[in-house]
Amino acid sequence: MPPAELPSTVTIKVNDCIIVGKAQPASEAYPKPLDLFYGLRYGKAGRSKAPVSEPLKSASGGIDATKPKPPCPIPMAPQETSEDCLRLNIVRPSKSGNGPMPVVVYLHGGGFNFGNPLDADMAAFVARSEKDIMSVSVGYRLGALGFGPGEEGDDARSNLGLRDQRVAVNWLREWIGWFGGNGEDITLMGVSAGAHSVSPPG
């Protein structure tokens, strides 16, 4: 029996940090070849704690971003979840030579209790765009972990999921340029709770 074919990969070096993503060839479903980077950690947070940005840094053996990471916990989750879920997924056209690309950030819906950043096929969104763009889907804490009750005036524990989203956008402003994106040209989009997240000013 022949050995299983290894997936094609793409590598980015950010200072001393090596990031290995998945290279996806063009197909009928995805007209452009794409590079996908799954599960990049943008922040860390203890339970009931505000998030802190996590810079890209070297790890033993580099960062394997070829496969999705477990999403944030939700009730009756159909798959493995993890509280280490302040992660984002990047999709870009392969070998774009048109300079820094606009970045579209997708925030998933689910009433702030359910959902997954990979619910929407953002790879198809990028592959079928007339102009070269990048997409980023963001994981943020949900339910009691992200929107649990706090004492009146307890700002430290309120709306932690929304704080996660803000940390993710600030992370992108700093780091997306290494992936070919324009940190000064970021558009937020979402559905349901994700659209609600986009609406507040600031």
Regions found by a protein language model. Name each.
Residues 1-156, 162:
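Non-catalytic accessory segments of hydrolases
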Residues 123, 184-186, 199:
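Extracytoplasmic/periplasmic beta-strand context in beta-sandwich domains
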Residues 95-100, 150-160, 167-188:
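Gly/Ser-rich "nucleophile elbow"/oxyanion-hole loop immediately N-terminal to the catalytic nucleophile
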Residues 195-202:
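Short glycine-enriched nucleophile-adjacent loop
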Residues 85, 162-169, 195:
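Short alpha-helical patches at coil-to-helix transitions and adjacent helical residues
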Residues 108, 126, 166-173, 177, ...:
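Amphipathic alpha-helical interaction motifs in eukaryotic regulatory proteins
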Residues 190, 194:
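Gly/Ala-rich beta-loop-alpha elbow adjacent to hydrolase catalytic centers
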